[in-house]
Amino acid sequence: MATDGASCEPDFSRSPEDAAGATAEPAKKEFDVDTLSKSELRMLLSVMEGELEARDLVIEALRARRKEVFIQERYGRFNLNDPFLALQRDYEAGAGDKEKKPVCTNPLSILEAVMAHCRKMQERMSTQLAAAESRQKKLEMEKLQLQALEQEHKKLSACLDEERNKNKHVVLMLVKECKQLSGKVIEEAQKLDEVMTKLEEEKKKTTALEEELSAEKQRSTEMEAQMEKQLSEFDTEREQLRAKLHREEAHTADLKEEIDKMKKMIEQLKRGSDSKPGLSLPRKTKDRRLISVSVGTEVSVTKSVACQTDSAIESIEPVKKLPLTVPAKPSTGSPLVSASTKGNMCTNATLVRPGIDRQASHGDLTISSVPAAPTPSASRTEENGPSTGSAPDPTSSTPPLPNNAAPPTVQTPGTAAQSYSQAPPVHSLHSPCANVSLHPGLNPRIQAARFRFQGNANDPDQNGNTSQSPPSRDVSPTSRDNLVAKQLARSTVTQALSRFTSPQTGAPPRPGAAPTGDVSSHTPVSRTSLKTPGVSRVDRGNPPPIPPKKPGLSQTPSPPHPQLKVIMDSSRAASAGVKVDNKTVAVPPSSLPQGNRVISEENLLKSSSPQLPPKPSIDLTVAPAGCAVSALATSQVGAWPAEPPGLNQPACSESSLVIPNTIAFCSSINPVSASSCRTGASVSLLVTASGWSPSLTPLLMSGGPAPLAGRPTLLQQAAAQGNVTLLSMLLNEEGLDINYSCEDGHSALYSAAKNGHTDCVRLLLNAQAQVNAADKNGFTPLCAAAAQGHFKCIELLIANDANINHAADGGQTPLYLACKNGNNECIKLLLGAGSDRSVKTRDGWTPVHAAVDTGNVDNLKLLMYYEAPIPGNSFNEEKLESNIIDLDQEEESPEGIPKTVVPADLINHADREGWTAAHIAASKGFKNCLEILCRHRGLEPERRDKCSRTAHDVATDDCKHLLENLHAFKIPLRISIAEIQPGNHGSDDFECDNIICTLNIRKQTSWDDFSKAVSQALINHFQAVSSDGWWTLEDMTFNNTADSSIGLGASSVQSIMLGNVPWSAGQNFTLFPWEFMRKNKAEQVTVILSGPQEGCLSSVSYTSMIPLQMLQNYLRLVEQYHNVIFHGPEGSLQDYIAHQLALCMKHRQIAAGFTCEIVKAQVHAGFSKEQLVDLFISSACLIPVKQSPVNKKIIIILENLEKSSLSELLGDFLTPLENRSTETPYTLQKGNGMSECYYFHENCFLMGTIAKACLQGSDLLVQQHFRWVQLRWDGEPMQGLLQRFLRRKVVNKFRGQLPSPCDPVCRTVDWALAVWCQLNSCIARLGTPEALLGPKYFLSCPVVPGHAQATVKWMSHLWNAIIAPRVQEAILSRASVKRQHSLGQTTAKKHPSQGQQAIVKAALSILLNKAVLHGCPLQRAELDQHTADFKGGSFPLSMVSSYNSCSRKKAESGAWRKVSTSPRKKSGHFSSPVWNKPDLSEEGIKNKAISQLNYNGSALLAKQKSLENDLSLTLDQRLSLGSDDETDLVKELQNMCSSKSESDISKIADSRDDLRRLHSSGNNPAFSAAVNNPKMPVSQKEVSPLSSHQTTECSNNKSKTELGVSRVRSFLPVPRSKVTQCSQNTKRSSSSSNTRQIEINNNSKEEIWNLRKK
């Protein structure tokens, strides 16, 4: 090794550079490790290790010899006598190490160099070896991964082959199926073609059949017309033959009478007695005047005219023939009737009624009602029957004339023809009552009765005239020997009957009557009418001709009846006028009899084919001169025509047409009322006005007394017409059968009840009439009254023990008929009397079927819920009425539906076809009726009819939807929050129960579906509440699994209560949810969220709307760091959060087996550190050092720490709290000079709350020792808390639904949110963070739909009670921050200067208008009314603008937060302190300025005047305002006024008058003088604030005229940065400011809101 070491010595013969270069070259070649293999590297490493060991041995040996060798090498070659020895020593001692060169070779240095080189090589080799090993390992790992990938690849390939084979098989199967399906499609297409071909053939056949059917129908119609024509001809021929027979019989009788008279006269002559000359052959001695009527082949229509009560006075002396003119139409100009004549006549009306089909079945009751209005001459028809209309006195000499009728005159023969051609037809003396519609066929019985009861044609009537049949051409004179006796007998009976009969009104026209012509005037006619025994009838097959319009007539349409042609010549069939000996004859008024009454009887046509008769011709026998024409006509009344079974006859079917004393022509037809006249039956032809009946007619005609045998028929007629007087007279007669029934079985009581004549029913019942007498169809009077809806008659009948459950032949009961009629009062009376609801008709229908069939909801409700009240129990009746009313109100709960009294069997009863009431309601689309039926729990909607159809199968679309949701049970879903103690930590505004939606539970709903519905409803609610906008649940797409933004979801639910039964999601009961809810009477589903009691914060998150994740983070901070303080603006829910976190921690510790206690302390201004120490020691949070830690968990909450100094209160506890061990104790000094050491253990948690936005001063020293949770108003969770909370409030108010964004409630809530945000933003700009507000005060915002005024009123209370005082205090404290040192804090706060007060009020006004009133949802007028409720809302802001800042405070001062804004380029004459939306256009500014000139008028001026007097500043006070803080505060207010980022408040400037009043205020004489007199010199001291303000104004403002309108400038200030400054002239202008004038440029383009010259 020594040799090796010696060999390594350097060669000093070469230079060091050459040696180094020679050594480096072989080293690069020998030691290139990268090229060596692993074995070579190992060999090299072993050689080098051996070398190192050898060298270490050499080094140790050399060290032992080092000293000796060193001395020998250094000094051994020199001796002491050598002079160079000192030089060598000095050389080595004086030079540096780098400059010295070794004298001899040093083996130690060489060895050290070799050792260093070897170490480097060893490190390099080890590094390379480690790299090689790592590469080797990596390579092996990659090989293993490659093998694994290859194996996986093989597996995947095998799987792929299998799948390929499977897919190939599936594809083959699909191909086969496609082929099969294509074949089926082709077959179906062929079948479809065949079916379509058959369908076309069937359609063709159907079309052919329809054509044949129509042809057959037409053929049958023609045949029927021919048959009708033939029948008409037969009737005509029969009538002619009968008339001829009658004439022959009458002629024979006359001849016999003449023979008898002649015999008597011969006898008298023989006896020599005197005879009266007038009795012998009167008809031969008098002129015989006949009015012949052409009959031809037409059928005659008869008119019955009754005798009048007053007998006519006959004139015996002959009268000269006078011209008689009979106009054919009523004249409006000059009627031919004397004013002294009066009479009654038939109404000129067309009465058309449908014919009766005698073959039709009337098993059911069909009630048809037509509303009617009576004619002007007719009286009203009431339930008691028609009352007598007011008629003029029949004895008066002058009848009433219409307004348009001229006085009647008697025309001369020369004017008669002209009058006839110009005047419309009128019913005059010889004009009968016109009949314009005739019955198609007259009953043979009526014909027989007519000819049976008709008097002799030649018998003289009571006026002395004989009636002659129309076709008679040669009637011989008759005898008049018995004339006086017959007249006396006839008049006696007539007057007796008429005495008890009041004048009746004419029956109004029937429903469906053909319209008659309108007559323009109402002309009074004579009381004497003309009888018409025979008038030709209309051919049934052909329609009647329409009378042509004649020239010269009035424009009113002519009446449908033709003119009456009266002829004197018996050989003529028709004539144009009435002539006597070819002269026109006029009857004088003096010859007319008085007191005659006319009653007509009319036959009616079918309503389906109303026809008009042709012009008939009438033959009249004219009496001799001096005798009036007879008014007594032959009666046409016979037996009643047979009525069909059933109750569909009109109520006035037995009523005759009664004519009042005075009848005027009506211009139109008024339909008859339903209670007085109905369609479906013929009219009985009665003469009830005079008391005549058909049975009495022949006897009265013959002049004999009236026996009582015909009284029952008259009784029925009086009862049917409601004639109480006649009825009472007849009932007082003895021997009268009041229970007499006609051939249809109708009794008098039946007729009265059917027509609703209550008084008649009462009279008959008092007379012991049979109350249960039935007609031939089994209908009783009660049935008739129920069918017609006469509830008063029903009440009387029930009171007289009528059978309420009587069933007719078809099974119809009165209740059934009442339900068919649809009268609630009738149904209620019958049900109250105990009528049976279950009686069934022949068809199987019940009253429920009838009520449902009419679709009357009220009737069905009465049937199902009305109970017969207990006598004397009024409470029961009130309860029943309330139950019926409650049905109209939709109740969600099953308890809201009253109990039905109808059993399930009756509801589900089926008729003969198998249809239930539900089938009927569903098929007719009566959804309301079906809904009421569905409320019955026993309804079986699946009941099938005989065709196997359910109600759903036959229902309409609406009813199908109702049946599908039949068993849906709506129940509200609520979220309940437990453990919310009222009045604790600001939780008063939290709602414990919130309705989130309504669940719709159907009968088939399973528990899984119910669980999913509840979970989905919760998720939808959480996401809807936490969403950003007002979106409905339909507009929002929710994720079923994701939680909401507040972190709540289905997992937050602790339990669910179904009513009072607990239930958890996924739990199944034996009953389905629908049955379970019904059985347990569950009215709601309550969801209980997990809360602190379970160690969770879900309920806390939902209550406070703080995201769950943030609450969990707060809890983690408290558990981890033990010392946490929550701080933020006042009202940020610090105390609530701390308390809920403490509760959660407590229950978690209790669940873990520890005991835990919560200790709360309210910190106030007098709370000392000693009290805090006592609290810590008493709660075992601070324990002595000698004591071992306790296992009890203690949570201490220090509230309201902002009221004390943190550094003074917690300064000594900071280190012990941060380092909780015995090593950092807290030393407590006791009063006796002793001290004791305590420490905080690990089981103690300390939480504090501070209602302060930020810390200041010495309190910052405490900050680093605690964990701080800052609740900023502009950051989460406070930023979105109010929005989420109010949104949940709205959802609860709308019962789980979100209103539309345009709803007023949404706008009101958005306004409340904007107020909170804008208010804090403005307060932050003012630099008063102590006035910031948290969302707590806004949680009580009322949500009242439709009443935004309540929210504005609440906002005014909040502003006056909380916001305004806090802002005032904050601004005062900021404005007087530097004055407190000189004046004292107490003095500054208690006595603020007027300038400070002005700043406060200006700030309040700006905040109110910018943050509160801006965006209010109320209209301008309503908002103006509420503005006065806000404190500081009427402050004149010109006070702020008139303030001038001092130049001492520069703009770059950091005390206030500045906002770079630009001035608003707006001006105008505004007087309202309310901000509107900005309108930057000049036109908009002008319009708004003009529109707001007169805002609040005198009230505003008076209020501002009082404020200005209080707030006007003197010059000294202005100078005192010039402190730096106040200047910056005013600048910030000015910036807020001009900020574009805020609401536009440039419109709050005062009017010109207000400014002048302010300028001229007596409190500021110098200022007002400077403004009002700009040329007056002012001292520098007086105007220094103004001049300093003017130094920054630009002297070259450009003038511009704005639309030619000069406006008052807005005096709100603008920032200095936005005004061009003339900095070069600042000092000069400041020094010479006393000579400058105040300029106000109204037309400047740049708005400079400062005081300048006008």
From Swiss-Prot:
Top-rank lineage group of the source organism: Eukaryota
Gene Ontology CC annotation, any one: dendritic spine
Entry's localization field: Cytoplasm, Cell cortex; Cell projection, Dendritic spine
Modified residues (Asymmetric dimethylarginine): 499
GO molecular function: protein phosphatase 2A binding
Sequence ranges of the ANK repeats: 710-740, 744-773, 777-806, 810-839, 843-872, 913-943
Compositionally skewed regions (Polar residues) per UniProt: 384-395, 411-422, 518-531, 1581-1598
Modified residues (Phosphoserine): 1523
Function: Regulates the dendritic spine distribution of CTTN/cortactin in hippocampal neurons, and thus controls dendritic spinogenesis and dendritic spine maintenance. Associates with the striatin-interacting phosphatase and kinase (STRIPAK) core complex to regulate dendritic spine distribution of the STRIPAK complex in hippocampal neurons.
Protein name stated in the entry: Cortactin-binding protein 2
Organism of origin: Atelerix albiventris
Lineage: Eukaryota, Metazoa, Chordata, Craniata, Vertebrata
